[in-house]
Amino acid sequence: MLMEMNRYLSFTLFTGLSLLTTIPIEAYTLNPNKTATSILQTNVIEVRSITSVQPIVIYCPVGTVPQLPYQVWVTYSDGQGEYRQTKWSNSALSTEQSEADDKVYPIGSQYTINGFIIGDDTTENGYPITAKIEVVDTKNTISPKLIAHTIPLNNVKINGNNRLTSNRDLAIKEIISWDVSQQLYNYRDTYGLSTEGYTRSDGWDSPETKLKGHGSGHYMSALALAYAAATNPSHKEILRRNITRMVNELRECQERTFVWSEELGRYLEARDFAPEEELKKMKGTWEAFDEHKTKWATYGYGYLNAIPPHHPALIEMYRAYNNSDWVWAPYYSIHKQLAGLIDIATYMDDKSIADKALLIAKDMGLWVWNRMHYRTYVKKDGTQEERRTHPGNRYEMWNMYIAGEVGGMGESLARLSEMVSAPEEKARLIEASNCFDSPAFYEPLSKNIDDIRNRHANQHIPMIIGALRSYLSNNDTFYYHVSHNFWNLIQGSYRYSTGGVGNGEMFRQPYTK
């Protein structure tokens, strides 16, 4: 009996991303009547290695950390080239702080920073590279124009019978199935209105959760975006009815704060709510909040939220994240509600409802301005205890874990400033937007110092989006540099291969991904 066996083996070896060798092996043919023979055939491809790297010369503005490239162009021995990821040796915080010190590196200083191209086995750490740094007396350059911007959803149409249209319609059907009364329950409870016939809220918007209202904000955004995308007339009509009901009932709640003070000769405002001595004694328990919500007449003109203003006021006393006793991200929830109203004002084609949604958002935005302008400040120097001597230091407020999480307040208030027409209101809303700057976070970033490490990613990414939106609204280049530096640091030091940048909602240490 003749038995023949052909085996083909192929070995492919990689170093980093570079293909080294492919070896197909035709092993042998066996015949019991013949002497066994074997033939080994090899086909070796020349090893590819990095032969050169594009020179790295950085002209670094004095008082800043060099903006080192997170990718560099390399050329291989086969003549091909590509961008490869880098890792630099100056990532220690103390090193960066020294590089940003104009006394250590004055104008005209020259020095080098070593690094590696990762994924290469030239050395244990990778292919060695060096950046030459020269400190110069110039400012960072500004991108002269927008490279890209979003297209308004109501200018986009998806046609035909396909997965996109199917998913759109499924999403809209889900949104119109939600009970609008459930989204209004907490507001009515907060403003002393009857909740009879209204479905009680649940989950993270339940009456026992201080994050309540954030889900209703998402709901309003969902209604607005679904309305802009809907093509089915019956779906569009249901969405219109739900939007109209939300807007009308929220305005009813808000108008209960329009309380005239004969003593002051004006309406009660945010600055009048909880004078300092009262604020210092304010409690954050649920028993206290049961009492707080009976005092809606003191909330201040324009306040609109699913929880009384005691919640955002408590952060002025630096109260910690604690759903039972203190706070849970007060301004995070306010942002979601502002964003939802702004989305309705943007996408609703019923002008009366769109205008009313904008009016609600504007009045709430001006409540925020009033509170920030008159009752808060920024003090950066001293110890934490010294910075917290008096209520309302935003340096401390926005640097607190979760309690100081403000979502996209900066972005929404800047966006709102672009939608109102009165110059004074525009100016106040931009000021309010910038009140949500975090000096402890922004100022190191403005110098390209990586103070991202170990921060709460969910809390700080929206701040950067707010900074970029502020730049578009006020043309202050400080905000551009903060945003631009953040992006480069994230791409080079924190981005995982999946595209994520955090672990457990937290940034970790640079290059530990």
How would you label these PLM feature ranges?
Residues 140-513:
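Glycan-recognition and catalytic cores of secretory/periplasmic carbohydrate-active enzymes
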Residues 43-81:
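Solvent-exposed, low-complexity, repeat-rich "mucin-like" stalks and linkers
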Residues 27-48:
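Low-complexity, acidic Ser/Thr/Pro-rich repeat tracts that form intrinsically disordered stalk/linker regions
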Residues 2-12:
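Bacterial N-terminal signal peptides that target proteins for export
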Residues 63, 79-81, 122, 302, ...:
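Detector for glycine-centered tight turns/loop "hinges" at secondary-structure junctions
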Residues 78-134:
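Serine/threonine-rich, repeat-prone extracellular segments and beta-strand-based repeat modules
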Residues 12-22:
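Bacterial N-terminal signal peptides
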Residues 134-140:
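Extracellular interdomain linker/stem segments of modular secreted and single-pass surface proteins
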